[in-house]
C-alpha cells in the first residue's frame, strides 16, 4: 500500500516490537530494527498493544505499528 502526500509517495509496512519492560520500549525496538533496513522512516502509528502471559505473569509487551517511509523509485 502506498500513500501520496504532496509530491511524495510513501510505503507503509507493519512491524511488531517486543520488550520485557514496556509497550514504549517495544515500539522503540521495532523502530530501531526497521531503521536498519528501511531508509527515510517518517511516521509510526501504533495500531495494537498486547502482552504475552505465562503462568499468570506478563513476560512480554508487544506493540504493533504501521511505519511509513519515503518510496524510492
Feature map (PLM): residue ranges:
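N-terminal, polar/charged subdomain of small-to-medium soluble alpha/beta proteins
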Residues: 2-73
Amino acid at each position: 500500500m502506498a500513500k501520496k502526500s504532496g509530491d511524495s509517495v510513501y510505503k507503509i509496512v507493519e512491524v511488531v516490537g517486543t520488550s520485557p519492560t514496556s509497550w514504549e520500549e517495544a515500539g522503540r525496538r521495532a523502530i530501531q530494527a526497521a531503521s536498519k533496513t528501511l531508509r527515510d522512516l517518517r511516521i509510526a502509528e501504533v495500531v495494537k498493544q498486547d502482552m504475552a502471559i505465562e503462568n499468570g505473569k506478563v513476560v512480554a509487551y508487544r506493540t504493533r505499528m504501521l511505519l511509513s517511509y519515503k518510496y524510492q523509485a
